[in-house]
Amino acid sequence: MAATTERTIASQSEFAKSGVKWPRIALVTPVYNGEEYLEATIRSVVNQGYPNLEYIVVDAGSTDTTIEIIRKYEGSISGWLAERDNGMYDALNKGFARTSGEIMGWLNSSDLLQVNGLFTVGSIFRALTEVEWITGRPTKISATGTTIDVLPVPRWSRERFLAGANKYIQQESTFWRRSLWEHAGGRLSTEYRAEGDFELWVRFFRHARLHSVNALIGGYRLHDGALSASNMERYNRNCDEIAAREVERLHGRKKAALKAFRWMSRAVHPIPKVRGLWQRVAMRGLYGMRGRDWAPVIEYGENGWRLRR
């Protein structure tokens, strides 16, 4: 597994010197009073050296040294704005509206891109024209910026996602084509405080399969300002409501099966012993289920990027 990742990173360094025309990537960082980690976030982007990048930082009216940090990197980013907004997703909508890149993604102000992450993204979308959105290996980063956990490569399916398996798509590692963004409505919902990414993924799944990439792209930083246990409970509850509404859009046997499965999951949740058995048997079974929308994994081999079916 490690050898695959190392070969991928090396190949991107070679590609960087090859004169290849890279797709334009539009990346946005929303921030509010982010002085502790923002500089590391910006550096993880600009130090990539990706040659066709639109990078916008959107500040929500910070009162600490955030603006000073942004100004320090004015010459290395595409632009920035500072004004009050209606939450993170409103800030992201403002940022994306100022970009034209054909590939899109965002990076929160405490998180990091992995080395050559943008070259990985650009080369995949350039090589695999049928792929519309991707996510890298789920990765956790310590408060000091060290990668501390790299999870196995999940395979994604809309059916399993709506059933409750594979719930957490790591946003820091997720990128998509602008055409998919536009088909899905062209904006993030500002109705939510923390669940707007989940709601966007639900809309993306209506139009395209999500492909995992067996490579490191970005990482989520664990720190004191991350979601607390109580906030996580609210996040899960709101995501469950979003998924339930999406299931209602379906028809026939698929809708009936998903509703029954979700009902059973809720019914056993208050019973610890039964819940444990359900999670071991039913939920693990979902992870291994090959649905019709089960997406191949993207891997790098001797001849470049390929889909492993």
Task: Give, region by region, the residue ranges found by the protein language model.
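Glycine-rich, basic loop-to-helix element that forms the pyrophosphate-binding segment
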Residues: 82-99
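N-proximal low-complexity "stem/linker" segments adjacent to membrane-targeting elements
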Residues: 1-47
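Short aromatic/hydrophobic "clamp" motif used to bind/position activated sugar donors
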Residues: 104
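Membrane-proximal basic amphipathic "stem/tether" segments
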Residues: 1-6, 244-309
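Acidic helix N-cap motif at the loop->helix transition within catalytic regions
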Residues: 36-39, 64-72, 116
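A conserved acidic beta->alpha catalytic loop
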Residues: 51, 59-68, 108
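Conserved nucleotide-sugar donor-binding catalytic segment
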Residues: 27, 97, 150-239
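Conserved donor NDP-sugar-binding/catalytic core segment of glycosyltransferases
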Residues: 112, 116-148
